């Protein structure tokens, strides 16, 4: 089935918007309460219904980051960046994930992109220092 996308939107319109907003709020609440296992399940279910939900992709990736599953986190960060390619928070966690996997070249690429957006970003400067640059 082909989903048609709106004229100015990169994502398809959500046919079950009210229910998905409710699920998103539940997901955020679980995350805020640090119930990561439940939040991960809730976020994954939400992404099955709304696969292009930028914030949910970032938050699920963040949970995987906290669980030290950096490769899995990066896949969610990449999907999130397909929607919002200049999201500094996503880029920064992706850079940290690459650093944890000793993929310094990729971490540097993320840092360079952040510097294009925010040249004075302190976490990026610190990360680049840690990477000996």
Across the structure, where does each feature detected by a protein language model lie?
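Register position in tetratricopeptide repeats
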Residues: 32-33, 66-67, 100, 130-133
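Canonical positions in the second alpha-helix
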Residues: 45-46, 79-80, 113-114
């Amino acid at each position: 089935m082909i989903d048609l996308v709106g004229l100015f939107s990169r994502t398809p319109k959500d046919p079950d918007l009210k229910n998905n907003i409710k699920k998103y709020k539940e997901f955020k609440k679980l995350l805020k309460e640090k119930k990561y296992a439940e939040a991960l399940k809730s976020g994954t279910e939400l992404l099955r219904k709304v696969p292009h939900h930028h914030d949910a992709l970032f938050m699920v990736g963040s949970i995987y980051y906290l669980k030290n599953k950096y490769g899995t986190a990066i896949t969610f960060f990449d999907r999130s960046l397909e929607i919002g390619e200049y999201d500094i928070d996503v880029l920064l966690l992706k850079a940290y994930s690459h650093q944890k996997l000793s993929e310094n070249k990729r971490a540097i690429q993320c840092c360079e992109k952040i510097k294009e957006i925010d040249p004075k970003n302190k976490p990026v400067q610190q990360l680049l220092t840690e990477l000996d640059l």
